[in-house]
Regions:
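Helix-loop-beta segment of a Rossmann-like dinucleotide-binding subdomain
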Residues: 94-116, 153-201, 297, 353-361
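N-terminal Rossmann-like FAD-binding beta1-loop-alpha1 element of flavoenzymes
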Residues: 6-33
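C-terminal catalytic lobe of FAD-dependent flavoproteins
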Residues: 323-412
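Glycine-rich FAD pyrophosphate-binding loop
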Residues: 26-47
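Helical element adjacent to the flavin cofactor pocket in flavoenzyme catalytic cores
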Residues: 173-226, 230, 234, 238-239, ...
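Dinucleotide-binding Rossmann-like beta1-alpha1 core, especially the glycine-rich loop
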Residues: 50-163
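Active-site substrate-recognition segment that forms the wall
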Residues: 19-23, 50-52, 88, 103, ...
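Conserved Rossmann-like nucleotide-cofactor binding loop
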Residues: 16, 39, 242
């Protein structure tokens, strides 16, 4: 048994666990991070698209712009609480954001391609509104105003529903194209930077440590693993599987089939095609050197994955005939879905008992907002905004590679 008593034990070494561990360490808390796998960020954070969402994609969602506001709030918090990280190269301006040099984010803006349905007035109106919202976000004054609380239905004028419909009719393409504020990211650089700061503040990490039991006793928590027992004042569970196991909370699993392709043309953009028929929505995120991730939407049923993957590949080859599929994989997405929801695109922070908390993250991009909000819920104040040095180098191999990168490395 470990004789140390930590302020916090964090169960789960994905982006949720890493950002929460860092924000706690930033304030001088003693933190132990437990991960069942050999490497950190080796499940959901490994397979995702590396897509930094501005919220624009959810301007089409019928949720009163709730998801959009959550994602804009994440960018607010990114600027406020992560701006002193060396790799944080997204910069606020008086009119949108810019990517400065190399670092966490790439100067690779994702093009939205709305499929034209000229005889579907509802879709045409939704597209018109979405385009207007993108314009508002692209022109937002990040230097003077926060965005998360600035965009709701009151910002959408009646004219926004129809003033872009003539442009859709005038377009000769099957799609109406609009460059969005969404960008691609370098997730391993980002995770490594955040982890290095936490390690510099004495974060302890134990990998290959499967949690067998979590016991709340005498105003503290005992976490029993396959190799040891650890004591802490509090614990937060950031692993969906562990949340389901120990807290009896149902977690929904869905499936995201992705093809890793090469020979992507240099003049092709990262893009997403949008259609009211969701299964026709495909996307391509460029990775450099002619490599790309070709994907679509997330499937609810595993049995539908193979046929849908074939559809995705065929559609991408139709647009870029020269691409070659290197390999494919299926990313698992595990979400806490509330009653009446099909998907969870936000995050949930729950206090399950006096000393045990749980967190489920809907989008990687929301981690920058989720971690500071977790700190606020616990300590009823804002976390420190400035990180301290020295930082500690992250041991090679501690963080897993992304699935797409592993596929490319193994193919060469």
């Amino acid at each position: 048994m470990d004789s140390n008593k930590y302020d916090w034990i964090v169960v789960g070494g994905g982006i949720s666990g890493i950002t929460i561990a860092e924000i706690l360490c930033r304030d001088g808390k003693s933190v132990l991070l437990l991960e069942k796998n050999k490497q950190l960020s080796s499940e959901t954070s490994k397979v995702f698209h590396e897509w930094m969402h501005s919220g624009s994609l959810y301007s089409l969602a019928p949720d009163k712009l709730l998801t959009l506001r959550y994602l804009l709030g994440a960018t607010d918090d990114l600027f406020e609480y992560y701006n002193s990280f060396s790799g944080m190269n997204l910069c606020p301006t008086e009119s949108g954001v810019i990517v400065d040099g190399t670092g966490w984010f790439n100067n690779d803006y994702i093009e939205y391609r709305y499929r034209k349905h000229l005889f579907n007035p509802v879709w045409s109106a939704l597209v018109s509104r979405s385009i207007n919202i993108i314009d508002l976000l692209s022109q937002h004054d990040w230097l003077r105003r926060k965005a998360g609380s600035d965009y709701d239905d009151s910002r959408v004028r009646f004219s926004h529903w129809f003033n872009n419909i003539p442009k859709q009719f005038a377009s000769k393409s099957d799609f109406f194209c609009k460059l969005s504020p969404d960008i691609t990211m370098n997730s391993r650089k980002l995770i490594s930077d955040i982890l290095s700061v936490a390690l510099g503040k004495d974060l302890e990490i134990v990998t290959e440590s499967s949690v067998l039991n979590i016991i709340e006793k005498n105003n503290s928590v005992i976490v029993e693993t396959n190799s040891n027992s650890y004591h802490a004042e509090n614990a937060v569970i950031c692993s969906p599987d562990m949340i389901s196991k120990f807290l009896d909370i149902p977690i929904k699993t869905s499936y995201a089939p992705i093809a890793v392709v090469e020979n992507v043309p240099k003049d092709e953009k990262s893009f997403v095609e949008l259609d009211y028929n969701l299964k026709k929505c495909i996307n391509l995120l460029k990775k450099g050197d002619g490599i790309g991730q070709a994907g679509g939407v997330t499937m609810e049923r595993e049995k539908d994955v193979d046929s849908y993957l074939s559809y995705i590949i065929a559609e991408h080859k139709d647009r870029n005939p020269g691409i070659k599929v290197v390999d494919t994989y299926v990313g698992l997405k595990k979400e806490l879905v509330q009653k009446g929801e099909d998907r969870n695109y936000i995050y949930h922070i729950n206090q399950n008992s006096k000393n045990i908390w749980s967190v489920v993250l809907g989008k990687f991009s929301l981690a920058f907002s989720m971690a500071p909000e977790f700190y606020r819920r616990i300590y009823h104040k804002n976390p420190p905004k400035i990180i301290e040095i020295p930082m500690e180098d992250v041991k090679k191999g501690l963080i897993s590679e992304t699935s797409w990168k592993e596929i490319i490395i193994n193919s060469r």
